[in-house]
Amino acid sequence: MDLKEVMAINLRRLRHAKQMTQEELADSSGLSARYVGAIERADVSASVTVLGRIADALHVEPADLLRKTTP
C-alpha cells in the first residue's frame, strides 16, 4: 500500500469519526468537494500544503493522515 492509499484510508476514517461530509470538510479546508473525494479514492496525491489544510480542518496532526495502521 502506498502513501497515497494510506492517506485515503486515514482521511475517510478521520472524517467519519468527526461526522463530517466531504462537502463540510471541503468548506472547512478551502478545497472542492470533488478534490476531497479524489483524495479519499487515492486518485490524486495531496501536496504538503493540502495535507496541512485538511489536518487543520479535522483538528488532527498531519502525521495522523499518513500513519500506517495495522489491520
Q: How should these model regions be labeled?
A:
Residues 30-45, 70:
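Recognition helix of helix-turn-helix/homeodomain-like DNA-binding domains
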Residues 49-64:
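DNA major-groove recognition helix of helix-turn-helix/homeodomain DNA-binding modules
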Residues 64-71:
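Short amphipathic recognition helices of helix-turn-helix/homeodomain-type DNA-binding modules
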